[in-house]
Amino acid sequence: MKLGRATLALLLLVPCVVRAVEPISLGLALAGVLTGYISYPRLYCLFAECCGQKRSLSREALQKDLDNKLFGQHLAKRVILNAVSGFLSNPKPKKPLTLSLHGWTGTGKNFASKIIAENIYEGGLNSDYVHLFVATLHFPHASNITLYKDQLQMWIRGNVSACARSIFIFDEMDKMHAGLIDAIKPFLDYYDVVDEVSYQKAIFIFLSNAGAERITDVALDFWRSGKQREEIKLRDMEHALAVSVFNNKNSGFWHSSLIDRNLIDYFVPFLPLEYKHLKMCIRVEMQSRGYEEDEDIINKVAEEMTFFPKEEKVFSDKGCKTVFTKLDYYLDD
């Protein structure tokens, strides 16, 4: 809650006061308005962000955002749509929703978490109820892991106490110190209450490059077999992805109890992007900047990117991550 914004809204509700009104009368009137204002959450939420959904999550709106903004990720789109909409429609979930998004840089993991946040809170990632942790920024020193565990537990407990529908996003899980993330295990388990706080309506999203090699191997096998990437099913890689991440010493999930105790609801693979997907990213970026689509520029930017494997050159090295800066060069030309 932003007190200044709420107070300003209150003052707007109070009629202009003529000079004849005594200060005490004005104070009583304002107190009455305050009492009534606070008594009606719906009225309050017209002027300040509230915990929970300001509006009911629209499955159709979420699907539209995923279809229009996330390219080449049929598996991720399906899992996110069903998992998030299903979880939010359940009035009494047994545990928090936990999604672990895996794939190379630039494939859309951060963008997907942004879409989820924006469809739950109007403020999106800037909402008071959405919390982003970046491993290299917030947990840089291995020697402080005990301190980080205590701080992480306190932060999550405090924020869920204030808002049951809090969203926590952990970026760079592949760079997080092993064992640190296990500090939040009690909050993800099947407990109704932990230290007088219920975490069952919270959402935890983990982003990682770990397991990207396994995802690429499956995608490349399908390509070499002449199959469409859309034929890849979640069952083709989810279990192998979980095992790969669990056994990866460079992953924050290395031998993690979150995986061992099956507390991650979905391991979501983000496939490496092909040339056609880069063109989609460039086209949408041009539209968002107010430019007309220019196929010549779109092709030039896409051709600037590098691809792998070295022989076949099927997948983009950096996904869509750097196409935006490449686009700047051609738009200014």
Swiss-Prot record:
Name recorded for this polypeptide: Torsin-1A
PTM comment: N-glycosylated.
Family: Belongs to the ClpA/ClpB family. Torsin subfamily.
Region (Interaction with KLC1): 252-333
Region (Interaction with SYNE3): 313-333
Membrane topology summary: Peripheral membrane protein
Species in which this protein is naturally found: Rattus norvegicus (Rat)
Cellular component per GO, a single term: endoplasmic reticulum lumen
GO molecular function: ATP binding; ATP hydrolysis activity; ATP-dependent protein folding chaperone; cytoskeletal protein binding; identical protein binding; kinesin binding; misfolded protein binding
Signal peptide: 1-20
Domain of life: Eukaryota
Record Pfam families: TOR1A_C, Torsin
GN (gene name): Tor1a
Keyword Nucleotide-binding among record annotations: no
Compartment annotation: Endoplasmic reticulum lumen; Nucleus inner membrane; Cell projection, Growth cone; Cytoplasmic vesicle membrane
Subunit structure and binding partners: Homohexamer. Interacts with TOR1B; the interaction may be specific of neural tissues. Interacts (ATP-bound) with TOR1AIP1 and TOR1AIP2; the interactions induce ATPase activity. Interacts with KLHL14; preferentially when ATP-free. Interacts with KLC1 (via TPR repeats); the interaction associates TOR1A with the kinesin oligomeric complex. Interacts with COPS4; the interaction associates TOR1A with the CSN complex. Interacts with SNAPIN; the interaction is direct and associates SNAPIN with the CSN complex. Interacts with STON2.
Keywords annotated in UniProt: Cell projection, Cytoplasmic vesicle, Endoplasmic reticulum, Glycoprotein, Hydrolase, Membrane, Nucleus, Signal, Synapse
